[in-house]
A protein has these predicted regions:
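C-terminal low-complexity, Ser/Thr- and acidic/Pro-rich disordered "stalk" regions positioned immediately N-terminal
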Residues: 154-172
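Short amphipathic alpha-helix segments
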Residues: 13-29, 89-107
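Active-site regions of enzymes building and remodeling cell-envelope glycoconjugates
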Residues: 146
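A cross-kingdom C-terminal cell-surface attachment/processing module
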Residues: 174-196
Length: 198
């Protein structure tokens, strides 16, 4: 399987992202609302800052400086900033709350994950449970105010032991190995770019 080479901008944006996360050391500051590579704008790392920490020019500058302090000068041209409503910590809490409450109610979860670009938690519910789960989310006091996007989604197996008839028929069998290969290649290219830039 040939994996296409990543553009230099994507490699540099990934390297900047890896440095940012390493600088956080597992503790996200309240100013941080997520990050993603914006391929529509020159393959830049778009770091999201919470609106309440960027509502004045002084706060915005301080929040940007705080993020850039974790990124080496060689990659700072590959970074841009936008604002978002929810901090990453708030999204993590929403993720945990939604996962726990929906599992406790017996709804079939396909996935639960943070969507940095849209500043929400994506929740995939198996189609048979989707309507009831969506109604539960809207009615439940603990869930209704959270940044959740609930959709119907089939489960993708990560075990590999199911028969082909039990698997989603949209080519789902090859998705996980390909995604893993791309992640590994991206990490290797990011590390190589980091060594090259320093």
């Amino acid at each position: 399987l040939a994996v296409p080479a990543l553009a230099e901008g994507v490699r540099d944006a990934n390297a900047a992202y890896n440095e940012l996360l390493a600088g956080f050391n597992g503790k996200y500051p309240d100013e941080y609302a997520g990050a993603y590579v914006d391929t529509s704008d020159g393959d830049k790392l778009c770091i999201l800052l919470t609106e309440r920490h960027a509502d004045t020019a002084a706060k915005l500058g301080a929040a940007q400086d705080k993020m850039l302090a974790h990124i080496s000068a060689a990659y700072r041209d590959d970074v841009k900033f936008k604002t978002a409503k929810y901090s990453y910590n708030e999204l993590l809490a929403a993720h945990d709350t939604a996962s726990e409450l929906l599992k406790d109610k017996g709804y079939g979860l396909s996935y639960v994950g943070i969507n940095d670009m849209n500043n929400v938690v994506d929740v995939g519910i198996i189609p048979a449970d989707h309507a009831a789960a969506a109604a539960f989310v809207q009615a439940d006091a603990a869930l209704s105010g959270l940044p959740l996007c609930v959709t119907a989604a089939e489960r993708l197996s990560q075990l590999g032991g199911e028969s082909p008839a039990a698997m989603p028929q949209a080519g789902g069998g090859a998705i996980i190995p390909l995604a893993a290969a791309l992640l590994i290649c991206g990490a290797m290219l990011g590390a190589a770019a980091l060594k090259r830039k320093r």
